[in-house]
Curated annotation (Swiss-Prot):
CDD domains: NUDIX_NADH_pyrophosphatase_Nudt13 (cd03429). Coiled coil: none annotated. A divalent metal cation 2 binds at residue 188. A divalent metal cation 3 binds at residues 188, 192, 233. Transmembrane segments: none annotated. Zn(2+) binds at residues 112, 115, 130, 133. It catalyses: a 5'-end NAD(+)-phospho-ribonucleoside in mRNA + H2O = a 5'-end phospho-adenosine-phospho-ribonucleoside in mRNA + beta-nicotinamide D-ribonucleotide + 2 H(+); NAD(+) + H2O = beta-nicotinamide D-ribonucleotide + AMP + 2 H(+); NADH + H2O = reduced beta-nicotinamide D-ribonucleotide + AMP + 2 H(+). mRNA decapping enzyme that specifically removes the nicotinamide adenine dinucleotide (NAD) cap from a subset of mRNAs by hydrolyzing the diphosphate linkage to produce nicotinamide mononucleotide (NMN) and 5' monophosphate mRNA. The NAD-cap is present at the 5'-end of some mRNAs and stabilizes RNA against 5'-processing. Has preference for mRNAs with a 5'-end purine. Catalyzes the hydrolysis of a broad range of dinucleotide pyrophosphates. This is NAD-capped RNA hydrolase NudC. One of its GO terms (biological process) is NADP catabolic process. A divalent metal cation 1 binds at residues 172, 192, 233. It holds the Pfam family NUDIX-like. Substrate binds at residues 82, 125, 138, 206-213, 255.
């Protein structure tokens, strides 16, 4: 099946196309959505920090206008990326997720981290360049392992103090330098709840642009230990029966997918599809 959305490095000197606008408050939208005629959008009273050509949607070029600040546009409002994730149009969310990552990266790499000189966008390449240092900086992607630990009809779920009240989720953490995905998973589970795991199975991945994570999802079986929550990181962790689960993460998340797949398998139901 052909994807409606493909990323690309587009020449911002070319006219036309569609554009999305991102400010500190999120993305601009109106009754027709988040895509605006590019030339019209650039004529509005917007504090444009930078423009990036980011790809093609249904064959049409799409650009990002990254803004210094939030501006009022008649008939329009601003909405955060997480809200778009929950809205249901997964293709538009993928466009905005990519735009958010490119905008964040470019904003954070306006100046060279080595010498402090201003960096410039490299033509036809997704990179920022410092000429005095001959240094290129590329978009950051942070690999994070996320795992559902299981024990028969039970699943191990935990909650962070940062979670929505009452919601429990799977365990997760970022990979350290020199660490394999499996080593990271084992370490994170041990650190967060002092549980040992075995029979690790890769389940899929999901881009998580908050701001630049790549979530690698796994199932793992309980191998031993008693739950001891990591101080300041895990507020509570429990074994839950698949027939009696607490409030769970949003259905579009890979955390929810990992849980739903295991529950479906235990109950003999059809397995869900991993959201993009």
């Amino acid at each position: 099946m052909t994807s409606r959305w493909t990323t690309a490095v587009l020449d911002t000197d070319q006219p036309g196309g569609w554009a999305v606008a991102r400010s500190p408050e999120g993305f601009l939208f109106d009754d027709n959505g988040v895509l605006f005629p590019r030339e019209w959008l650039k004529r509005q009273d917007l504090s444009i920090l930078a423009e990036h050509g980011i790809g093609h949607l249904d064959g049409e070029p799409v650009y990002l206008l990254e803004l210094h600040s939030t501006s009022e546009v008649p008939g329009c409002n601003w909405k955060g990326l997480r809200a778009f994730m929950l809205d249901g149009d997964h293709t538009i969310y993928k466009v905005l997720g990519y735009a958010a990552q490119i905008g964040t990266w470019a904003r954070e790499h306006r100046f060279c981290g080595n010498c402090g000189q201003a960096m410039t966008q490299v033509p036809r390449e997704r990179a920022m360049y410092c000429q005095p240092c001959d240094l290129r900086s590329y978009p950051r992607i942070s690999p994070s392992m996320i795992v559902l630990v299981t024990r028969g009809d039970e699943v191990l779920l935990a909650r962070s103090p940062r979670f929505v009240t009452g919601v429990y989720s799977t365990l997760a953490g970022f990979a350290e330098p020199g660490e394999s995905a499996e080593d990271c998973l084992i370490r994170e589970v041990r650190e967060e709840v002092q549980i040992e795991v075995k029979n690790i199975q890769y389940m899929g991945s999901q881009c998580w642009p908050f701001p630049h994570s790549m979530m690698l999802g796994f199932h793992a079986e309980y191998a031993g230990g008693e739950i001891v929550c990591q101080e300041d990181e895990i507020e509570d962790a429990q074994w839950f029966n698949v027939h009696d689960l607490p409030p769970l993460p949003a259905s579009k998340s890979i955390a929810r997918y990992l849980i739903d797949v295991y529950v479906a398998r235990r109950l003999g139901h059809a397995e869900p599809v991993l959201p993009g």
